[in-house]
Amino acid sequence: MSADTMRAPTYNVAHLLSAVQSEMTRGSEKGDPSEKGLKVTLEDRDLWRRFSKLTNEMIVTKTGRRMFPVLSASVTGLNPNAMYSILLDFTPADEHRWKYVNGEWVPGGKPDSPPPSTAYIHPDSPNFGAHWMKQCVSFSKVKLSNKLNGTGQIMLNSLHKYEPRIHVIRVGGPEKQRLIRSFSFPETQFIAVTAYQNEDITQLKIKYNPFAKAFLDIKEKGEHEFEDCHDHQQPRYPQLGSWFLPSAGTLCPPSPHHQFPPSLGMPSPVSHSCAVERYGSLRSHRSTPYPPPPYEQKYSPTSAYATDSTASSLSLLPAHEAWSPLGSSTHHTSNITTSPSHQYGGVWPPVTSSAVQPASSCGVGSPVHTSLLRAAYSNYSQPSTSSITGVPRPPAGSMSSSCAGYQNYNSPSEIHGGLNSTDAIGSYPTVGNQLCPGKVGAWSPLTPPSPGV
């Protein structure tokens, strides 16, 4: 490294001196070397007055809380070339302890013993008079506390009224420090609290405090986002309203026609029809209905049942869409097929998915889907004796298809063949030694024929 680079560089300090001189000149026009015209003016006086009308409150905490409104003032009449320090302290405004009752502050007893006197020194202190006069003096960093923690915070008693005071002190030079003047403003009085008591004060703090506005914006934003989200979800899921709150037209209207007579031991016709109509209306609102659950039939009366398709053995709920309306005059019947493996095949003929033939005579009924009959019949176990509900049944082969008035009924309503819903299943009249459900006659017990006949 050469000797030229080792030498200290030559600085031009003229621009630094000019900057200091201009800084001193900026506040000189407001100065007064005699300090006789010293004046301190409160900034934001109108805002302070709005809080004062409602009895202003300031929060005090253990760690300290900043003031709002911020205490700031403009100073004029200082000696621009003299050094000054500006301090802030708080003096009790009265001799009362206050309490908030029925929406207003009222005196609540004698005051507590005053805390140790403390003062807040402005961070720019000490400084030239020109510096203090060039712009307003703000005490934005002062913190109010209810604990004496020795960190330079101002300690105040809660529920006591205070008034801030600004002190201007001249420092430096051969002269000793001396107090020039103190200034106080009645608009800045407040009651120290640990939590805001007056809701109006809280609203003013939120409205005018820039830091509280951020909290208010977050709150309003959250509410708007919730409303927007709620509005956006409504068109995406229009079925929710009718799914949870169906319209009055889908809530179980009274039906004079019953699907199941009480004699079959089925559930209440009204409740069942309500359930069918209700779930039918609800399923119509789904974009993808639930798949129909399989129906497990524990007892199969005939071997022909085992050969039916799976769709014909579904539960009642998904099958209701294929039901024929009540009151239809169409008669359904099929050729009687007696299964050799079933003893009473003639009485309960098998139901298959094949096409049915029109009936010849013996009763009028209402056609119902095959799954309805099977679901109704599956509730009854196959009897081991030759009687059902007290009525004997003929042995196998004793019932022929030539029985006048016999049909292959496909529904419980057809089995009744016009009987009253309160009659028993076994109360059918007979033709010879055979049951004829379509004929309504007097009670006549049946006796099975002798083996030799």
Curated annotation (Swiss-Prot):
It is found in: Nucleus. One of its GO terms (cellular component) is nucleus. Residues 47-217 bind DNA. GO terms for molecular function: DNA-binding transcription factor activity, RNA polymerase II-specific; RNA polymerase II cis-regulatory region sequence-specific DNA binding. SUPFAM superfamilies: p53-like transcription factors (SSF49417). Keywords: Developmental protein, DNA-binding, Nucleus, Transcription, Transcription regulation. Residues 283-304 are annotated as: Disordered. PROSITE patterns: TBOX_1, TBOX_2, TBOX_3. Gene3D superfamilies: Transcription factor, T-box. GO terms for biological process: cell fate specification; heart morphogenesis; mesoderm formation; positive regulation of DNA-templated transcription. InterPro entries: p53-like_TF_DNA-bd_sf, T-box_DNA-bd, T-box_sf, TF_Brachyury, TF_T-box, TF_T-box_CS. It comes from the Eukaryota. May be involved in the transcriptional regulation of genes required for gastrulation. This is T-box transcription factor T homolog. It comes from Patiria pectinifera (Starfish). The lineage of its organism: Eukaryota, Metazoa, Echinodermata, Eleutherozoa, Asterozoa.
